[in-house]
């Protein structure tokens, strides 16, 4: 069979790198085929399950199957209908292979290797919603006969001989896996300090105050990958609710949502994150002495009283405006703003890690700024928010009650009342000059990059980054406290990926209101006479129904600012924001927006050459963009060491007449506005789901861009791919995939994760 080495194969040194680079690239999240999550030992031992996590049409909520939460042992997972992929029978090297679905999948690929050139044949289904076949050991022979090309890695190049042999040796040896990682010595001391703060306060805080603050922090950080000051860049932790006190082994309290009733005494504990880090769920939150001082300033030392603790009933717990009313709005808002990108990432990378339901309501590229927490603005005042808190309830309170379209009825009425309250509060305010109005915008203290963000959306995935990136966008948001908080509780804390159709539809429809609110705040900074025209241009068709929301028209017609000097106030506003935010807005974006040579960052001759060439690629626009991948990574080879090559991301920004329907596929002509599609190019790796790779030598970069800009139809694109693309069949595919992951780690040593290849195109 195989000659096994005398020493056990090292899981971390030999096996895990192969799993991460060849298997986790598809098996890393809720959308891992057959729920086979290969990011950790626990996921491998758990095995597979035929039920899909993502099922927007289900009428009843599914039982959650979250790794490290909903079951802790292999036996418990078997009770939840997970089937083994490793041998669980008689243990010997032959049985360990014969009885391993994982081995047989690998063997199937060796027996039926895929083509090494051209596109994959039509019998390969690489669509995201493809039917899944999840054979058990007893079903495998039938599966292999029906799907001879269904070996692993599916629809990707074969493993190398060395990779295959290493995995087979490991499986034959019984798939030995070391114990879980434990906290480092540097982290241990800090964990004790943080657990003391969360569970006991500062010594000067009441029990109620300590409990309320800890609950607030947990409900906002429960999905964070916590990183402690002074620890390794790749060492992360999780904040959990445990039934055991600090000093004892953690026993996670499993609830469907972080604000559900724990039904027992809660201790807030910090535990080591186990397994591989994948880009699509990696959200880093830094904990340090400085952060602790900030929390003490905002929450523990601030003067307020907590006379009673909020209920865990859904109508209270899902509405943070009500649940945490005792904590000053300023403290809550500043906490969110300090790491605004993290909280925006929450609905991009959180439970909705395949987020068509949530993300289909936002544009493909837009900018975000925030109201200043110290500005004299009514929606930021405690009294106003406390009086309107009932209007700020969201469908999260329904949990999985099947109240279809509640967001179009009950919650629409609440939104109308909130709008009317805002109008009444500001109706007597006169307009201010646009330059003075800039003082309403948070400037991040002149140093916090979270003050200006850009969001890119690509159908059902998205990314967010610091600064204003790309050309001036069609739309932008100005966010206040209640919008940011409600986004978190609707799509992160309150979103159940296992929920039913009603839950998912109502979340999506309510997010439409939140997007509108952020956009309308931006519009209020424009002249009233232009505002409605711009808004009508943004969205056509179905979106016009927004006018039916009582209060919106009046809000749109109120004059808030004056002093515009051009006929294009929207661009003028963007430029005002750029000047006001200064370096926090970015470097001017030489590739996409600023044509002045002064915007070109200092770089080597070849990098400048590549930048100038890629600048021309941003001229690609209109109908042809629909042919191109949403997110394409470009490797420009510099002729030296691989680590000296540079990476670009080419992003297709799709324009829409409407972003209001969750059921219409984005390609339907009544939604898409192909003529206004654009391209953005950045000199870094953006996004978690690359759709395609291009590789080009620096001396060929001008020809690369010329060929790219010459694409007019599908045939032109296929010819371009034949020259520069890395197809699923390409002999060097894995080499370049590895390079992009390594390059991401070089660019972002702490924030990087393994890219997901589930969406990689067959082109």
Where on the chain are the PLM-derived regions?
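Aromatic- and Gly/Pro-enriched helix-to-coil junctions and flexible linker segments
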Residues: 1-763
């Amino acid at each position: 069979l195989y000659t096994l080495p005398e020493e056990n194969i090292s899981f971390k040194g030999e096996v895990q790198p192969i799993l991460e680079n060849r298997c986790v690239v598809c098996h890393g999240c809720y959308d891992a085929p057959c729920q086979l999550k290969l990011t950790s030992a626990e996921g491998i031992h758990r095995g597979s399950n035929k039920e899909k996590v993502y099922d927007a049409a289900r009428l009843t909520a599914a039982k959650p199957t979250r790794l490290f939460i909903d079951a802790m042992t292999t036996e418990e997972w078997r009770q939840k209908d997970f089937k083994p992929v490793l041998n669980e029978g008689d243990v010997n090297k032959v049985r360990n292979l014969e009885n391993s679905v994982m081995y047989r999948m690998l063997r199937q690929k060796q027996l039926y290797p895929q083509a090494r050139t051209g596109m994959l044949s039509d019998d390969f289904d690489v669509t995201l919603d493809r039917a899944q076949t999840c054979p058990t050991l007893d079903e495998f022979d039938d599966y292999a006969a029906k799907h001879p090309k269904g070996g692993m890695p599916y629809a990707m190049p074969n493993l190398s001989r060395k990779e295959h042999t290493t995995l087979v040796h490991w499986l034959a040896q019984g798939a030995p896996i070391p114990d879980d990682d434990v906290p480092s010595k540097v982290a241990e001391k800090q964990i004790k300090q943080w657990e003391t703060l969360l569970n006991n306060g500062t010594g000067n805080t009441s029990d109620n105050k300590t409990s309320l603050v800890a609950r607030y922090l947990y409900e906002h950080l429960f999905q964070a990958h916590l990183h402690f000051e002074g620890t390794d860049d790749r060492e992360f932790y999780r904040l959990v609710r445990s039934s055991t006190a600090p000093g004892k082994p953690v026993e996670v309290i499993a609830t469907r949502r972080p604000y559900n009733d724990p039904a027992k005494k809660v201790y807030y504990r910090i535990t080591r994150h186990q397994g591989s880090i994948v880009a699509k769920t990696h959200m880093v939150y830094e904990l340090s002495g400085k952060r602790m001082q900030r929390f003490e300033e905002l929450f523990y030392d601030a003067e307020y009283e907590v006379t009673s603790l909020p209920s865990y009933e859904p109508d209270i717990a899902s509405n943070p405006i009500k649940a945490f009313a005792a904590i000053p709005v300023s403290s809550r808002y500043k906490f969110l703003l300090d790491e605004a990108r993290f909280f925006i990432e929450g609905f991009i990378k959180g439970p909705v890690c395949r987020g068509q339901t949530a993300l289909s309501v936002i544009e493909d590229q837009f900018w975000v700024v925030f109201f200043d927490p110290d500005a004299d603005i009514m929606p930021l005042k405690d009294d106003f928010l406390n009086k309107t808190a009932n209007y700020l309830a969201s469908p999260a309170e329904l949990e999985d009650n099947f109240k279809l379209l509640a967001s179009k009825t009950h919650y629409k009425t609440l939104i109308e009342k909130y709008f009317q309250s805002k109008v009444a509060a500001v109706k007597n305010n006169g307009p201010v000059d646009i330059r003075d109005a800039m003082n309403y915008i948070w400037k991040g203290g002149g140093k916090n990059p979270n003050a200006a963000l850009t969001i890119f959306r690509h159908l059902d995935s998205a990314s967010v980054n610091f600064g204003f990136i790309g050309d001036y966008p069609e739309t932008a948001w100005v966010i206040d406290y209640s919008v940011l908080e409600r986004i978190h509780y609707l799509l992160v804390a309150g979103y159940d990926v296992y929920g039913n159709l009603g839950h998912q539809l109502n979340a999506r429809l309510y997010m439409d209101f939140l997007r509108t609110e952020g956009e309308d705040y931006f519009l209020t900074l424009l002249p009233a006479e232009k505002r409605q025209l711009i808004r009508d241009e943004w969205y056509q068709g179905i979106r016009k129904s927004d006018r039916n929301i009582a209060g919106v028209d009046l809000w749109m017609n109120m004059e808030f600012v004056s002093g515009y000097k051009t006929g294009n106030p929207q661009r003028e506003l963007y430029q005002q924001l750029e000047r006001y935010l200064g370096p926090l807005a970015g470097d001017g974006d030489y590739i996409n927006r600023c044509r002045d040579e002064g915007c070109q960052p200092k770089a080597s001759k070849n990098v400048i050459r590549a930048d100038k060439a890629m600048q021309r690629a941003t001229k690609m626009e209109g109908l042809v963009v629909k042919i191109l991948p949403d997110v394409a990574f470009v490797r420009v080879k510099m002729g030296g060491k691989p680590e000296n090559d540079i990476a670009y991301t080419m992003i297709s920004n799709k324009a829409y007449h409407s972003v209001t329907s969750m059921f219409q596929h984005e390609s339907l002509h009544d939604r898409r506005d192909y003529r206004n599609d654009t391209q953005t190019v950045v000199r870094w790796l953006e996004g978690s789901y690359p759709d395609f790779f291009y590789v080009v030598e620096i001396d060929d970069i001008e020809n690369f861009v010329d060929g790219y800009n010459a694409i007019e139809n599908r045939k032109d694109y296929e010819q371009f791919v034949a020259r520069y693309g890395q197809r699923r069949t390409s002999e060097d595919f894995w080499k370049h995939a590895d390079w992009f992951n390594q390059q991401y780690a070089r660019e972002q040593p702490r924030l990087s994760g393994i890219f997901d290849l589930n969406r990689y195109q067959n082109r």
